[in-house]
Amino acid sequence: MLDLKRIRTDFDTVAAKLKNRGVSEDTLTHLKELDEKRRTLLVQSEELKAERNIASAAIAQAKRQKEDATQQIADMQKVSADIKTIDNQLVAIDQQVTDIITVLPNTPHDSVPVGADEEDNVEIRRWGTPRDFNFEVKAHWDLGEDLDILDWERGAKVTGARFLFYKNLGARLERALYNFMLDEHIKEGYQEIITPYMVNHDSMFGTGQYPKFKEDTFELADTNFVLIPTAEVPLTNYYRGEILDGKELPIYFTAMSPSFRSEAGSAGRDTRGLIRLHQFHKVEMVKFAKPEESYQELEKMTANAENILQKLGLPYRVISLCTGDMGFSAAKTYDLEVWIPAQNTYREISSCSNTEDFQARRAQIRYRDEADGKVKLLHTLNGSGLAVGRTVAAILENYQNEDGSVTIPEVLRPYMGGETVISPK
């Protein structure tokens, strides 16, 4: 959530930044007008309360002196009625301010490229060279069925579209991947966490999914619970409402969890395969950092995600998302896109973001600065390290052989009991 004081004192800068994120200046102007009216009413309310206190004292004195206080009482009742009217106005204005400010996206960092959509994203670097196949490559969904390791037909029967069963070495490959990813992140100083897979609405507000993106989630009927769309939500909210010791920062968390997404608005996109599912495993990275260190931590987090792809030998590129393509809470985002041979393109496999103090303000996560003893908002960061199903897709396609088998990447073999290849039955 944005700082209302910042909008008030630096309106033009905030308006220009949010314009690049698709927010009309009229929206901010209306917010500013509401804020000004609110502040005026607060002053009036305080003045009337002071007047009421004086009147109350005068009434008390008149009664002590056995004097008639009828007029003073009538005057005080009128003042009290005026205060109640103003307070009701303030409640209504506060709700309007909340309705606007809670759906405003974060302001982009100055280094973020300005653009409307993914066409305006900027490639930063590439790693690895896509393999030159001397045979016709298969899509990962065909490989999965031919190898009897992925079953979409029964997934659809048991649940519905965008669900599947992992089987045999497919299930083992998925498990090997997330164990490998977690182990690599732990080496880099991340604390492993097993989170709840359901969170409450306050947690969804804290990380920015609510109220704007409720349609993208699965809520449990007649409860306050939501299935997590990412482990970012429980990990970030771990410290919601707390004040941390500045000497403890930065703090790194990592977790593997299922993620549940309704994929509203994705009809017709990636209807086959592992790219877009309603339920998938993802290894998440979350950091809590001091403001002056958060962009250095973003570079480190991105490198942690890249490390996984490099050790798996998967070609990828790093993209800096433009203002029009970033997520709601992000101030800056790097996407990692892995090479998918059957599609002859790179597809997103990780997204690493610095939200600055946007989530921390919503969730009230603060720290006491050891330098001056003041309590301040910290910065939160999150990143995929990696989306496991998409990594399976990338391995199946990049490591496929002409005979229909798939070679298991060397770093995963210790996690798979020494298996080296997945062969057709």
From Swiss-Prot:
Main location, first listed in the record: cytoplasm
The enzyme's E.C. designation: 6.1.1.11
Pathway given in the UniProt record: Aminoacyl-tRNA biosynthesis; selenocysteinyl-tRNA(Sec) biosynthesis; L-seryl-tRNA(Sec) from L-serine and tRNA(Sec): step 1/1
Top-level enzyme category: ligase
Domain of life (superkingdom): Bacteria
Cysteine-cysteine disulfides: none
UniProt keyword list: Aminoacyl-tRNA synthetase, ATP-binding, Cytoplasm, Ligase, Nucleotide-binding, Protein biosynthesis
Pfam families in the record: Seryl_tRNA_N, tRNA-synt_2b
Substrates-to-products reaction catalysed: tRNA(Ser) + L-serine + ATP = L-seryl-tRNA(Ser) + AMP + diphosphate + H(+); tRNA(Sec) + L-serine + ATP = L-seryl-tRNA(Sec) + AMP + diphosphate + H(+)
Gene Ontology terms for molecular function: ATP binding; catalytic activity, acting on a protein; serine-tRNA ligase activity; transferase activity
Positions with a binding annotation for ATP: 261-263, 348-351
Gene Ontology CC annotations of this record: cytoplasm
Chain sites annotated for binding L-serine: 230-232, 284, 384
Location in the cell: Cytoplasm
Oligomer and partners: Homodimer. The tRNA molecule binds across the dimer.
Domain text: Consists of two distinct domains, a catalytic core and a N-terminal extension that is involved in tRNA binding.
Its biological purpose: Catalyzes the attachment of serine to tRNA(Ser). Is also able to aminoacylate tRNA(Sec) with serine, to form the misacylated tRNA L-seryl-tRNA(Sec), which will be further converted into selenocysteinyl-tRNA(Sec).
PANTHER family reported for this sequence: SERINE--TRNA LIGASE, SERYL-TRNA SYNTHETASE
Protein name (record): Serine--tRNA ligase
Organism: Streptococcus pyogenes serotype M12 (strain MGAS2096)
Phylogenetic classification of the source organism: Bacteria, Bacillati, Bacillota, Bacilli, Lactobacillales
